[in-house]
């Protein structure tokens, strides 16, 4: 069932398709997402330290882990690009906790509007800039680090090289990229007849982690770390399902019963997929390959990430 519910599309990644698909999925309304995601307003896998960790705490822990992998804790004022920034949660965390200067880009009008409101409400306007912009339109800018959380699923294998090349071109020496994405299991595959492709992610394509690491290295990155958070996404989705059930009447009033049931099925089946290892999710850390002297600027161990 998971294979039927969660599939991939062969025609993804173009600007026009991306804009239409992102609007279809994310412009369902900020209030609906608030009911499902909770006050964290973060639509990606969280990181649960233990069974007592709340969803809000787990999302903050995920953001902190990414900040540390990117080295944002090493010095204040580093420039971060958050690709597919959603409602601004990662950007706000990096600015608030580490003094990072953040540019967040999204092609969802609803997300950009709400992200800007949240940034202003948090008093982070001097550090965080939210743009309604495609990441491919950032040529000429330079960043110390890039986070891409839950956006890679919209790229597609055919445009993966373009994606990594663009991001590499935006990084300076020793620049780091953290790619956080759901991975297919058993090779990248296409299924345009899947439930998720038809009703939830009309441009979604999951890529095998092996293809992802090969793609990164082929475009000038040195892959330094790969971590699976599979069990954590199962837990995250169970929290979202519980939130939707708790606020069912309000959700139906916002989006209609059919849409609410589609989301309930999609999230429940996804949770089962992660629980049964039919799906996976990986954080892949790459640095711009240094061909001059091989120095990386990386810590010797993962100890300071935890």
Task: Give the ranges of each region predicted by the language model.
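Substrate-binding/catalytic lobe of Class I Rossmann-like enzymes that use SAM or dcSAM, i.e.
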Residues: 182-294, 300-305
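A short acidic, Gly/Pro-enriched loop at the edge of an enzyme's catalytic core
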Residues: 136-146
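Conserved SAM-binding loop
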Residues: 115-116
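A short glycine-rich, Lys/Arg-flanked "PGG" loop and its adjoining helix->strand segment in the class I
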Residues: 161-174
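N-terminal auxiliary segments of SAM/dcSAM-dependent transferases
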Residues: 1-36
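Conserved class I S-adenosyl-L-methionine
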Residues: 76-84
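Conserved beta-strand signature within the Rossmann-like core of class I S-adenosyl-L-methionine
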Residues: 174-182
């Amino acid at each position: 069932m998971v294979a039927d519910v969660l599939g991939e599309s062969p025609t993804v990644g173009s600007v026009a398709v991306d804009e239409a698909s992102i609007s279809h999925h994310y412009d369902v309304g900020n209030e609906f997402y608030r009911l499902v995601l909770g006050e964290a307003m973060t639509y990606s896998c969280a990181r649960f330290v233990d069974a007592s960790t709340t969803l809000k705490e787990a999302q903050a822990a995920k953001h902190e882990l990414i900040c540390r992998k990117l080295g944002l804790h090493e010095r204040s004022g580093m420039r971060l690009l958050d690709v597919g920034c959603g409602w601004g949660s990662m950007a706000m965390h990096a600015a608030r906790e580490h003094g990072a200067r953040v540019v967040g880009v999204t092609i969802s009008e609803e997300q950009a509007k709400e992200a800007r409101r949240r940034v202003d409400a948090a008093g982070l306007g001097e550090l965080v800039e939210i743009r309604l912009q495609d990441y491919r339109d950032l040529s000429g800018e330079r960043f110390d680090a890039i986070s891409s959380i839950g956006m890679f699923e919209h790229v597609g294998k055919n445009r993966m090289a373009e994606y990594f090349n663009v991001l590499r071109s935006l990084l300076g020496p020793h620049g780091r990229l953290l790619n956080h994405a759901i991975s297919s299991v058993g090779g990248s595959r296409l299924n345009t007849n899947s439930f998720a492709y038809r009703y939830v992610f009309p441009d979604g394509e999951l890529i095998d982690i092996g293809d992802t690491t090969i793609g990164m290295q082929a475009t000038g990155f040195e892959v330094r770390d790969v971590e699976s958070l599979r069990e954590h996404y199962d837990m995250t989705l169970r929290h979202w399902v519980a939130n939707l059930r708790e606020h069912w009447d309000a959700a139906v009033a916002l989006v209609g019963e059919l849409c609410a049931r589609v989301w309930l099925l999609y999230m429940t089946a996804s949770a089962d997929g992660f629980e049964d290892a039919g799906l996976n999710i990986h954080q892949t850390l790459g640095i711009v390959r240094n061909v001059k002297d091989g120095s990386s600027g990386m810590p010797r161990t993962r100890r300071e990430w935890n």
